[in-house]
């Protein structure tokens, strides 16, 4: 979807990335996931949060890549980092030691209590239903797995999530909890030795959701320009609730769009050159 905001044209994907970038503030330490989180975190670094410290799972600290990495092992991350440490040090000292302000994650599937699934799709959720022909042992789709996301969700002081909005991704109950949000009933973190408070915001291409302070169920707090309540309801696999005071997300600025598009153009050019080399 493309939106026209006076003279600015932008896509729903650009809206999502820029909104996610705005959630990051200056002088915070962010443990970044690959994909959409990395895109948003680097846009933040290149715009309003130049002093944000980006950390990747491979052990790169305060990295400032000129192009987006394809994986946590991308050489661009090491070349532009202040320093690198071992993976055990990254997890045991930095993450488990409570030094990470924000964990920035993506996912294949998310439920109403912000639990994430990147392990298996064991049912067909496209129409909001379940297909019993599939299971964990015989999944419809087997996904890459959790990587460092379970540890990030447990130990980062708070977690940001960014994911495209559809009934396939936003399901009432995830097929498998790879990364805990608030558990199956919203109380799953209460008896766990968590350092962090869990997910604080979910940014999609349609809206912003935040956990209810009491129930921990995700609630829509802001609609992106051009998005209606009906759009969100139609794309969500449960009876989603809306905040009494519903905001409209500010549209991307010309500067934000320029930075994002230049970053993606540099990335495409660099990776294309690698493929032909």
Residue ranges of predicted features:
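Structural signal for hydrophobic packing residues in well-ordered secondary-structure cores
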Residues: 24, 28, 44, 48, ...
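Short N-terminal secondary-structure initiator segments
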Residues: 1-15, 149-157, 164
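Short, surface-exposed, charge-dense and proline/glycine-enriched linear segments
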Residues: 59-67, 84-88, 271-277
